[in-house]
Amino acid sequence: VSGQYRQASENRLSTLCRELLVSVAHAENDVVLRTPPGAAQFLASAIDQARIEGVLGTIAGDDTILLITTGTEQATAISDLLLGYTR
């Protein structure tokens, strides 16, 4: 059941990234995600539910998400992962 839940969360995250993710930038262990107005909390919740390895947590405003990772390499990998979902 856990594997099915994780797959469903990843599928949902992929769909939401395609629809809502406007831009991604990272510095050190932080990743900043931009969304249309009003969508940041929705996308941040999907990221939290996906339980991506290396993500410590998210903070969402109206159109911006601060995603905190465990390190610089993880920030790069997670940025690439989320951008990959938009293609």
Give a label for each model feature.
Residues 1-7:
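Minor-groove-contacting beta-hairpin "wing" of winged helix-turn-helix DNA-binding domains
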Residues 8-79, 83-85:
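Non-DNA-binding regulatory cores of transcription-related proteins
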